[in-house]
Amino acid sequence: MTDLTTHDLAQPGWQTRDHLDDPVVGELCNRFGPDAFTVQATRTGIPVVWVKREQLLDVVAFLKKQPKPYVMLFDLHGMDERLRTHREGLPAADYSVFYHIISIERNRDIMLKVALAESDLHVPTVTKLFPNANWYERETWEMFGITFNGHPHLTRIMMPHTWEGHPLRKDYPARATEFDPFVLTKQKEDLEMESLTFKPEEWGMKRGTENEDFMFLNLGPNHPSSHGAFRIILQLDGEEIVDCVPDVGYHHRGAEKMGERQSWHSYIPYTDRIEYLGGCVNEMPYVLAVEKLAGIEVPDRVKTIRVMLSELFRINSHLLYISTYIQDVGAMTPVFFAFTDRQKIYDLVEAITGFRMHPAWFRIGGVAHDLPRGWERLLREFLDWMPSRLDTYVKAALQNTILKGRTQGVAAYNAKEALDWGVTGAGLRATGIGFDVRKWRPYSGYENFDFEVPVGDGISDCYSRVMLKVEELRQSLRILDQCLKNMPEGPFKADHPLTTPPPKERTLQHIDTLINHFLQVSWGPVMPANESFQMVEATKGINSYYLTSDGGTMSYRTRIRTPSYAHLQQIPSVIRGCLVSDLIVYLGSIDFVMSDVDR
């Protein structure tokens, strides 16, 4: 599973390290020479290596060909470096592009960075090495104006095609009040309507062959089977899908831009809405990444409470996924079962946090308040109720021969294809790779829990993905039972000046302790200048936050990597040659919501 040593796992997450002892750094230096790189010390927990633009493709190709290769492009994006003041020892750069690549066999990551001058914002595309770089490069061009030479279709992806400017540049306004008043003239309205006219050539499609014309069909953005504001343009020969193009961005809210104008604390409610079904699961990577920046170790009680809430929301999300998946195939009853079961979870979550879907309850250094009296009874009642209900879902619907006939062998892909497209979560594990962050890279005390990671037999299809989620539900119930029986005693927040007001008795003795409290409450906590990273096993795959602090009260750069974005990009490669009815089943089996895609 991993070649991480006990020493690696024992290192504090908040320790600033250059990771020169990581084998991959030595391999790169032996191949390209030590002068080819600048190694950056961060709190990301992985090697961060600046490479020269002209060597980028060679370095990436080298990493892919190693005995234990780096096979998944996990993330790719950019940063406007122009206003960053703490850049000691780094290459001169107005902008930078980073490439986060994972080796499954090593269970290790590396982040490559390329420095760019404002006068020459060009970098070669890596789409020939990693096909999933396509969407990431399009978004980076759109947000920063960085051109990827050789990209097959470098167009806007999140914003309308008529949009002007690059929103994540530091000189781009962050609030509507900073723009000129919006006026929709007749000319502008006509221009906007004209831009919506469908032209196959603009999407890389052919109108037809020498002997026949293709039919083009819009599925969405208001179709019940598209699971949100999501459009897929289908190129059809009869009912067979010749090609298709996913069209995303309708739900884009500028979540990463918002991170640059909210304090470290006040951004927490926004994290709930990245994947609006995941609740506290979405808060976890953000608060852990901020705690790395601050150097905060939280009490064991906090870790266990966070795990408990995360698993409750995981079950809640999985139940909705399984029931709507069955509904997409044609059965209604499980949906009503699921909402009954999910109501019990919401009652429990509301009793603990005070809210239901979006509690914004995790805090930097702890949680908002301690567990209420009676939480054990509510959790025990749910744990007694749920296992038999799961059996009902399986017997009533998932073992149905019609459902199996509609889903087995449909939209199937293997492990290599999953890694090429950046697939994580159940979609990857169904191919036989048991990569679950809770097991492979434990966080928040998951290493103390006894649970299994369900793994498929080598092929991920619509049926295997949903059955894996059923088994994951059983494992989450197992984790919750351990939380109930082994909840540690102790405080529900860390005693740290960046996050927690001092006790009153201390302020009565030392008035200077109020200085920190005054600053944190009025301006927000000031985080040390550094970079941190945290990935978690979210409800739909791996979710991560990559934070850059410039020593201020707000994040200099907040990068959010979501699993659904990668999963939707994979759709054309899987569904070509299938029928439209197969696409409906495939969409239901992915488990996505558009807020997770569009951010």
From Swiss-Prot:
GO terms for molecular function: NAD binding; NADH dehydrogenase (ubiquinone) activity; NADH:ubiquinone reductase (non-electrogenic) activity; quinone binding. It is a peripheral membrane protein. Residues 213-599 are annotated as: NADH dehydrogenase I subunit D. It is found in: Cell inner membrane. Its EC number is 7.1.1.-. Pfam families: Complex1_30kDa (PF00329), Complex1_49kDa (PF00346). Keywords: Cell inner membrane, Cell membrane, Membrane, Multifunctional enzyme, NAD, Quinone, Translocase, Transport, Ubiquinone. Residues 1-189 are annotated as: NADH dehydrogenase I subunit C. Signal peptide: none annotated. In the N-terminal section; belongs to the complex I 30 kDa subunit family. In the C-terminal section; belongs to the complex I 49 kDa subunit family. NDH-1 is composed of 13 different subunits. Subunits NuoB, CD, E, F, and G constitute the peripheral sector of the complex. NDH-1 shuttles electrons from NADH, via FMN and iron-sulfur (Fe-S) centers, to quinones in the respiratory chain. The immediate electron acceptor for the enzyme in this species is believed to be ubiquinone. Couples the redox reaction to proton translocation (for every two electrons transferred, four hydrogen ions are translocated across the cytoplasmic membrane), and thus conserves the redox energy in a proton gradient. This is NADH-quinone oxidoreductase subunit C/D. It comes from Pectobacterium carotovorum subsp. carotovorum (strain PC1). The gene is nuoC.
